[in-house]
């Protein structure tokens, strides 16, 4: 059974891909919110054996627009009893456009959002909350219109637990 000769989604032109990306950016700006992306600046102290970063340092904050993809409730396990007692895990999923990330965040050091970086959401809880990126999904819209580079990133965030990290961004709310 052959495909339609009138629609060719994989040899599309750059203008169609740009239009699709423009629509994504515009919808995030209309329905989204302003937040801050805080990258981890301390790459030299990373433990290569265990893959963890014992001394995290967040010294810069980049204003970006995000879209809250699940606005009804927190995701994840929420409240449950573990071996350490009652744990409350609030997970949030947000969408950020690749173009706005590339325009505002220096591309020589950060090509994409990384796991372990922070996102500040100013309107949650009335005072704002910090969330840590647990997974940055860049394959959500896989090869839409034949484009390999993602149009947006879906970030899965978990509420940040402060443990002696250095946070000095210059933003008053953080």
Each model region followed by its residue ranges:
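Residues that form ligand- and interface-recognition hot spots within folded domains
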Residues: 98, 123, 135-137, 161
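Short coil-to-beta transition motif at edge beta-strands of beta-rich domains
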Residues: 106-124
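Capsid-like jelly-roll
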Residues: 113-115, 140, 164-166
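Secondary-structure boundary elements
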Residues: 122-127, 165
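Short acidic, S/G/P-rich loop/turn micro-motifs used as interaction or catalytic elements
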Residues: 101-102, 140
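Short beta-strand-centered aromatic/proline hotspots
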Residues: 128-142
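N-terminal disorder-to-order initiation segments that are Gly/Lys/Arg-biased
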Residues: 1-89, 93, 99-101, 148-174
């Amino acid at each position: 059974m052959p495909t339609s000769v009138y629609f060719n989604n994989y040899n599309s032109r750059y203008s169609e891909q740009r239009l699709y990306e423009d629509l994504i950016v515009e919808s995030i700006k209309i329905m989204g919110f302003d937040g801050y992306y805080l990258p981890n600046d301390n790459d030299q102290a990373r433990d290569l054996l265990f893959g963890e970063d014992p001394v995290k340092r967040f010294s810069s904050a980049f204003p970006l627009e995000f879209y809250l993809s699940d606005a009804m409730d927190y995701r994840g396990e929420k409240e449950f009893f573990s071996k350490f007692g009652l744990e409350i895990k609030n997970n949030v999923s947000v969408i950020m456009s690749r173009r706005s990330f590339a325009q505002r965040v220096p591309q020589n050091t950060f090509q994409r959002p990384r796991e372990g970086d922070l996102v500040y959401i100013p309107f949650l809880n009335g005072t704002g909350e910090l969330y840590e990126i647990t997974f940055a999904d860049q394959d959500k819209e896989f090869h839409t219109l034949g484009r390999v580079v993602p149009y947006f990133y879906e970030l899965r965030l978990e509420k940040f637990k402060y443990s002696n990290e250095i946070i000095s961004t210059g933003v008053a709310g953080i």
